[in-house]
A protein has these predicted regions:
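Active-site acidic catalytic loop and adjacent metal/ATP-binding pocket
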Residues: 29-38, 44-45, 183-230
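Protein kinase-like catalytic domain
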Residues: 73, 129-133, 240, 260-263
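A cross-family kinase active-site recognition segment
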Residues: 111, 115-170, 196
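Active-site activation/catalytic loop segments of kinase-like enzymes and analogous catalytic loops
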Residues: 229-264
Length: 266
């Protein structure tokens, strides 16, 4: 990605002539992000990974995720891609781009997470779930009910000639439990898919930007249908972690109390 390419994108979207060199923002795992200043303002430009975008459903999924973000932006603090000519995903010279208004802020992680942050996240999550939005083209998930060949894996491991067999012995000892747990997961999935809402689905600390005490939800690529209480448990594990692998009860309570203002927990 060079200056000329970004300048072409910004001009094509009528966002102004670029001032100075774009600055790469580190931290993205799959895509590249740049801070770009133009005569009209400051923007974050996401350059989508070209290899990922070759996948058959990648463009459709990305478009749907931004439709979800845009709809939620009416009710919760969301950083959604700018819509230009009715599109949030823009193609230029074979590459795909998303452009966002720049927001000053940073993600926070344990041990810098406090009750206030947890209460904010619980409140936002509860609001999202209570809205129960519908987006054309986004369909509920089917249950993932794969029973894995755990016994086959054990026999394959035994045939590898592994010298350190400590883990293999533990695997064999736990084999019946593992098979039973797998069955229970499949049964639980059949129940969970009966109650689904559209949500963010990846609300861990790296996907929330904080400007002072104000949160903004970013990176909506994973957005879609999920069981609300399954996501609540995932969010609790993300945000109530004390940084040492344990859950802080006061943080747990803050999330649940705020969430319960919008969703029934009885």
């Amino acid at each position: 990605m060079n200056f000329n390419q970004i300048n072409k994108v910004m001009n094509a979207l009528n966002l102004g002539e670029v001032i100075g060199e774009p600055v790469e923002v580190k931290g993205g795992l799959l895509h590249k992000m740049f801070r770009v200043c133009t005569l009209s303002g400051s923007y974050a430009v996401k350059v989508l990974n070209s290899e990922i975008m070759k996948r058959p459903t990648a463009l459709k999924n990305t478009i749907n995720s931004e439709k979800i973000a845009a709809l939620f932006a009416n009710s919760i603090p969301v950083v959604a891609a700018l819509t230009v000519d009715g599109k949030q995903i823009h193609e230029k010279d074979g590459c795909y781009y998303m452009v966002f208004n720049w927001i000053d802020g940073k993600s926070i992680f344990a041990p810098d997470i406090y009750e206030m942050h947890c209460a904010n996240i619980g409140d936002i999550l509860g609001k999202m779930h209570s809205l129960n939005i519908i987006v054309n083209g986004v369909v509920p998930e089917e249950a993932e009910t794969s029973l894995y060949e755990w016994e086959k894996y054990l026999q394959l491991a035994k045939g590898q000639g592994i010298t350190d067999k400590t883990w293999m012995e533990q695997y064999e000892k736990s084999l019946n439990d593992i098979i039973e747990w797998n069955k229970q997961v499949c049964e639980a999935q059949e129940v969970l898919v009966q109650n689904q809402v559209i949500s963010h689905r990846d609300l861990d600390p790296k996907n929330v930007m904080w400007n002072n005490d104000d949160p903004f939800l970013i990176d909506w690529e994973a957005a879609g249908y999920v069981n609300p209480y399954q996501e609540l448990l995932e969010v609790i594990n993300y945000w109530a972690d004390d940084g040492k692998g344990n859950l802080d009860k006061s943080y747990f309570d803050a999330i649940v109390k705020a969430y319960g203002k919008h969703m029934n927990l009885a």
